């Protein structure tokens, strides 16, 4: 398995991959919890949402927020990105939820190769506290316009 591809391809899972790579072992989360995330995403037809929940080490909340600002601004300009927002849990300030909406898997793949994304993931690799969780969703009720 090409770990650098996995690093980019699994979005916020990348910070756990980076930790594992530093120890010369397989990424535990990729193996145990999300072995087929990219395969699952590839099966999605059309637009989809990706919800990623993760925690950072206590005291690193501001580090994440500062690192996320340029990535969020650049990502919202990317082809196929309809939503890209970082939310912070009000009851547990070390917990964050990234809500993304993409026109296609191909658009998400391009996003994962962007320098601003790689930079954010590199920061997350240093400050993450545990593995992320992922939800792949399809919007079923359209808002009224």
Regions found by a protein language model. Name each.
Residues 58-83, 116-120:
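Short amphipathic alpha-helical segments
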Residues 8-18:
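Bacterial N-terminal signal peptides
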Residues 1-8:
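Bacterial N-terminal signal peptides that target proteins for export
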Residues 48-55, 85-112:
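Short, well-ordered beta-strand segments in beta-rich or mixed alpha/beta enzyme
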Residues 76-79, 112, 124, 128-131:
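Sec/Tat-exported extracytoplasmic proteins
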Residues 23-47, 86-91, 120-145:
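Glycine-rich beta-strand-turn "strand-cap" elements at beta-sheet edges
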């Amino acid at each position: 398995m090409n770990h650098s591809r996995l690093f980019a391809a699994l979005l916020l899972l990348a910070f756990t991959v980076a930790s594992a790579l530093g120890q010369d072992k397989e990424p535990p989360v990729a193996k145990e919890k999300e072995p087929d995330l990219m395969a699952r995403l590839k099966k999605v037809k059309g637009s989809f949402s990706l919800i990623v929940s993760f925690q950072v080490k206590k005291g690193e909340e501001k580090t994440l927020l500062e690192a996320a600002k340029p990535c969020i601004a650049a990502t919202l300009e990317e082809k196929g990105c309809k939503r890209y927002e970082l939310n912070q849990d009000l009851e547990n300030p070390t917990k964050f939820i990234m809500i993304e909406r993409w026109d296609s898997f191909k658009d998400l793949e391009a996003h994962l190769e962007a320098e601003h994304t790689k930079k954010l993931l590199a920061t997350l690799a240093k400050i993450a506290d545990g593995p992320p969780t992922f939800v792949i969703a399809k919007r079923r009720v359209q808002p009224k316009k």
